[in-house]
Design a protein with these regions (language model features):
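Short, acidic/polar
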Residues: 42-56
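Aromatic-lined carbohydrate-binding/catalytic grooves of carbohydrate-active enzymes
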Residues: 22-28, 33-37, 57-117
Length: 198
């Protein structure tokens, strides 16, 4: 970036609007503890339509920060779409943490109207946002992933995190994860939860 462009950029006042995508457009007011996505609802990327974005831009906002866009661990079953199911014992609640990334190359299916077209919906969200004169920010968390990270959308030739790890070592600089060799997670004393009946 040239000095003149940098100085011009620094004189521009930034105003960032954060939209936690899965809650932003949610119109279901039920707040059932440990409720399913059907019971408690979820916002969708399509809820951030041109009208909403025009209202945000009208506030003097320059950037919209979309939180929770990258696919992360949840208890919602999307295995019919080829998305690996997560162990509920390692998911924060049912909706999960948007920072427990399960695939850096994919979009969270919860916030898509059509799961099969979630990337297209995200691209359309970016297009709509730019069309209203706003810039887009999303969270990218390079050092915090879900324990069951498994990319289904990675480019050819890219290994999953942990794929080449030496699991026989507690710590190795070349590993993506920490391990407890010879120690196994015993969840036999943890009560099970019937997700079908709640």
């Amino acid at each position: 970036m040239g000095r003149g462009l940098f100085i011009s950029f620094m004189k521009t006042k930034l105003a960032i609007y954060q939209a936690f995508t899965r809650t932003f457009g949610n119109r279901i007011l039920t707040r059932k503890e440990y409720g399913t996505i059907t019971e408690n609802g979820v916002g969708k990327m399509n809820d951030l339509d041109r009208t909403v974005l025009q209202q945000i831009q009208g506030l003097g906002i320059t950037h919209v920060w979309y939180t929770g866009v990258i696919r992360h661990a949840t208890c919602t079953d999307y295995s019919l779409f080829g998305i690996p199911q997560q162990n509920p014992h390692v998911v924060k609640g049912r909706a999960g943490s948007p920072y427990a990334i399960t695939d850096y190359y994919d979009i969270d299916p919860d916030i898509a109207t059509n799961v099969d077209k979630r990337m297209e919906e995200f691209e359309n969200l970016v297009f709509r946002t730019h069309a209203e004169g706003l810039k887009v920010l999303i969270d990218f968390v390079p050092n915090h992933v879900a324990r069951q990270y498994k990319s289904i959308a990675k480019p050819e030739g890219v290994e999953d995190l942990g794929q080449g790890d030496d699991t026989g070592k507690h710590f190795d600089m070349q590993n993506n994860f920490y391990y407890c060799p010879g120690e196994y997670l015993d969840l036999s004393g943890v009560p099970t939860y019937d997700y079908a009946t709640g």
